[in-house]
Curated annotation (Swiss-Prot):
<feature type="binding site">
    <location>
        <begin position="260"/>
        <end position="263"/>
    </location>
    <ligand>
        <name>substrate</name>
    </ligand>
</feature>
<comment type="similarity">
    <text>Belongs to the NAD(P)-dependent epimerase/dehydratase family. GDP-6-deoxy-D-mannose reductase subfamily.</text>
</comment>
<comment type="function">
    <text>Reductase that catalyzes the conversion of GDP-6-deoxy-D-mannose to GDP-4-dehydro-6-deoxy-D-mannose (GDP-D-rhamnose).</text>
</comment>
<keyword id="KW-0560">Oxidoreductase</keyword>
<dbReference type="InterPro" id="IPR036291">
    <property type="entry name" value="NAD(P)-bd_dom_sf"/>
</dbReference>
<feature type="binding site">
    <location>
        <position position="131"/>
    </location>
    <ligand>
        <name>NADP(+)</name>
    </ligand>
</feature>
<feature type="binding site">
    <location>
        <begin position="105"/>
        <end position="106"/>
    </location>
    <ligand>
        <name>substrate</name>
    </ligand>
</feature>
<dbReference type="GO" id="GO:0019306">
    <property type="term" value="P:GDP-D-rhamnose biosynthetic process"/>
</dbReference>
<feature type="binding site">
    <location>
        <position position="160"/>
    </location>
    <ligand>
        <name>substrate</name>
    </ligand>
</feature>
<dbReference type="InterPro" id="IPR001509">
    <property type="entry name" value="Epimerase_deHydtase"/>
</dbReference>
<dbReference type="GO" id="GO:0070402">
    <property type="term" value="F:NADPH binding"/>
</dbReference>
<keyword id="KW-0520">NAD</keyword>
<dbReference type="Pfam" id="PF01370">
    <property type="entry name" value="Epimerase"/>
</dbReference>
<dbReference type="GO" id="GO:0009243">
    <property type="term" value="P:O antigen biosynthetic process"/>
</dbReference>
<feature type="binding site">
    <location>
        <begin position="39"/>
        <end position="40"/>
    </location>
    <ligand>
        <name>NADP(+)</name>
    </ligand>
</feature>
<protein>
    <recommendedName>
        <fullName>GDP-6-deoxy-D-mannose reductase</fullName>
        <ecNumber>1.1.1.281</ecNumber>
    </recommendedName>
</protein>
<keyword id="KW-0521">NADP</keyword>
Amino acid sequence: MTQRLFVTGLSGFVGKHLQAYLAAAHTPWALLPVPHRYDLLEPDSLGDLWPELPDAVIHLAGQTYVPEAFRDPARTLQINLLGTLNLLQALKARGFSGTFLYISSGDVYGQVAEAALPIHEELIPHPRNPYAVSKLAAESLCLQWGITEGWRVLVARPFNHIGPGQKDSFVIASAARQIARMKQGLQANRLEVGDIDVSRDFLDVQDVLSAYLRLLSHGEAGAVYNVCSGQEQKIRELIELLADIAQVELEIVQDPARMRRAEQRRVRGSHARLHDTTGWKPEITIKQSLRAILSDWESRVREE
């Protein structure tokens, strides 16, 4: 039986992949069309978004760039918290009573001691930047809404996800773009990066999407789920692998302007709860992800 799905943030990195994923995969979900432009900070624009009532909602939209959150924390909180509240209120006014999946972030955990790795959902969050604060606050709001309104509310905490189409403000996309330019003779074989002597838990965007859809079907109401690979990858090694795939020799140079605050040296999450509840597991290898990202950037660079 086909179920109606409404998704915010369809124009973003994950949203675009979700549209393609639903069009190509055999799933019980039919993506509802968006009848007009809307702004989550303008409640009047939300009232008639749903000619057909959705069975489920995935709330992807938000301000996700950490440096921007430091630059304008008020705006980040408005978009990520007040925008979420406006969406919840509009859905309630429309009579929604289905499944609501809020997409938070693994960044809410903050600084985690290496002895506490891998990161489990039971770990108490200690957000260290305004973006993470806004996501944790919105998590609480959504879970409270589920209790008081009787909706089936779930929270996903994705860790770093990667794939074709990501902005080059993210480290792997930035490296892939620069390497693609080197391969085409458009820049010197000198790669400018931020702090790459750290490890992160990277997951392909296709695996992220399959996790979200599994949660819609099988997740437990009121629960929080890490969405991650369960593996840590050193960023420097991934850049070297990108260069190897592209067959490009390069010099790596750290750019102080690209360094971020509130970094920690190692990140590795646990997806045990997600696997135990839904049967989900990652399917795409890191090398497959990097090949797809590099191929995408080679095409985009040719069009620049």
